[in-house]
Amino acid sequence: MIMEKSCTIQDVFERFYSSYEKRNSPPAHHRKTAYHIMNCKTGAFGVNISVCDDCGCISIHNNSCRSRCCPMCQEFPKEKWIDAQKENVLDAPYYHVVFTVPDELNSIIYSNQKLLYDALYHAASATLNELAKDAKYLGANIGYICILHTWGSAMNYHPHIHTIVLGGGLDDENKWKDTGGKFFLPYGVISKVFRGKYMDELKSLWNDSKLKFHGTAEKYQNSYRFKELLDKCYEKNWVTYCKETFNGAQSVINYLGKYTHRIATVSYKNLRAHETTE
């Protein structure tokens, strides 16, 4: 029998996670996250007790799990983070720059998440710093914030970096310098430089035997297959998105809060679920 009804992410985990775990043996950090989601605001993480000073009425509130991966826990931390960031954002133009890698790299990145996510940050930062300091483009030290996203709009695996870039910077004399309202870096140049820097990090990790290969990435243990992968990625035009999307500092930090306190499994994306009894 198949039953369909509206549900939350917590409902889905409560109904299906136990059988999923038996079939798939997920790693410890996945099991921990599942436990947090299933037990959030159930009393498993303790309670808060409030007593009215006037009438003595007692209210008991179950604590949240406070896991970053729990879609029920992020609204308050998001607002708290936004408030803390207000002092770090200038009243100046900001630009949204997204650094994306080809899908061909997904399996090897998934097998080496810590190393190759770090490489994404390194390559994006080095690209922005190098080009911004070039007098041909700006000739200044810029400010930016990088945020890693690991999923796409279809909730597929899609690692990429969102970067909020200040539309100007400080020159060698610590004086403000900008380009008068337009973004100072050509999109095509950003893509090519980022591609070169990320691929250099990937090759360096391979040469130092620091990469692991699991699942569909196992074939890249072979040096010939790995070189084929590199060649294919060098031939591609890496997609870089650049656009001024903000109207003032407050819009910037609100946007950042949405990305730093959000995961793929938000409840509104999972309105209905099918339950099959076996």
What are these regions (language model features)?
Residues 273-278:
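Short "domain-exit" segments at the C-terminal end of structured domains
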Residues 1-272:
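Beta->alpha loop/short-helix hinge microenvironment recognizer with preference
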